[in-house]
């Protein structure tokens, strides 16, 4: 494969930025070939001895694996390796023993030939099997079962084995951030350059790396499940069953004590009230003599008669204690379920990125299809969103130096796609408040506009997936539905095979590639704002309402850009985009102009 002219322009320009020790983010349109371009940049940097090592990092295992496999097509590629952490690979020896056990037949009640066929398929292009790929290939949806396999059948690779000293290393953000964020002394050699694919996802991955949660409701449900299974086991000691029954009632009692009108329906920042409640839960659940005796008996029982729900429960136990002891804790209360949840959330994530991550990065190239949030090609907003401090930050004992001198203005490279390949239309109707009538309107518009073509419809959540499916009952045989617990990759593979109409959530706005006739119609029934009840947005809204709306809108614009980019993936593709959300018409004019600007980059108005 040879570089196209626009790809060569990127490689040459980015290599110069690395030589000058710059931070450089560029925007690449759909079908630019960003993975291939990143690999060729890494090759150039190593071949010309600009640096000794290049680390290519991306947002998830699937993308990292895809880049690794694409490197096989690059002629005379320097040595490269995939390193994505020690708990992502399937241990085939553990799997063989697992399949012969009682617990194995409970979790994977499948014919061995089916499992062997899956393993054979997954090793055609890739020597090590990713647990995520294995579970998706078997179409496993149950979250508890997935979690059990991930926890118990992982290949025990050390970091050095999975991330060897090769000139080019391909990894994911979680692995890279874990090394930097949890080992303050960790540094790569000075002659290392970084290429960050999907760079806009880096701060989101930092949040996932640093945060945890404990739900009293989840704990209660796990207990009830374990009680039922053990009670039905004739060999279970009666004393264990009695202790479990008492623990279930104990948990309900604790929850009643924890309830407080001051926190009902609210999100609280870390304060004395939260600390007292967390301490109370910790003491009442885990520090009572009965609780300690219960855990000891459960561990003993598990050694004799294991089952996966109990394995998950015991594995999580220490993590729960760690969460409840955290200083950065807040409480949320579910009025629907009647239980409180505790969450750690570090409001200083950007500060920690500046201190522990960016301060150790000498130069990098960031690649994204959604760098720009306005029509201004020279904005630096994406650098700030990624936690790069443009000015000095004064801490108690030191100063984190500002990185503005390293930051280079965003450059948007031209691609090979033309807006004339697609059309777009925007509803002129006001938002319909009544859910039933609104979804009837959506169904009418979809039936009128999809023309029998392969179609994706983006809705607001899984409840809306079901509601729209009901309204499209007349074509139910064509529908494929996103499901909670089922991976995006798994659903997309089914859609590729069968075609039809995929009703999906905002999670499907990025990371999928549906070329040609695989996708020709895209309906957006709800502007893809993030779920504001999640901890990040709930805390931000409580702390600074004005800044919340600024960030909240920016997040929607980024996801909207990603969503409309799903339709046209190659110069041969054609299609239509339908924006059906009536709330568009009540948006501020500046937000409307931003969305229309990005629509017109990929389509012309119908």
Q: What annotation goes with each model-predicted range?
A:
Residues 1-27:
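Conserved pre-motif I regulatory segment
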Residues 20-40:
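Walker A/P-loop
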Residues 51-167, 245, 293-296, 537:
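A substrate-engagement module of RecA-like helicase motors
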Residues 62-65, 69, 148-292, 369-388, ...:
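Signature of the SF2 helicase/ATPase Hel1-core->accessory helical subdomain module
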Residues 144-164, 182-186, 287-414, 482-488, ...:
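A contiguous, basic/glycine-rich beta-loop/short-helix subdomain that forms a polymer-engagement track
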Residues 414-432, 485-585:
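Conserved RecA-like P-loop NTPase helicase motor core
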Residues 418-460:
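Conserved interdomain hinge at the start of the Helicase C-terminal
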Residues 459-484:
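Conserved helicase motor "Helicase C" RecA-like lobe of SF1/SF2 P-loop NTPases
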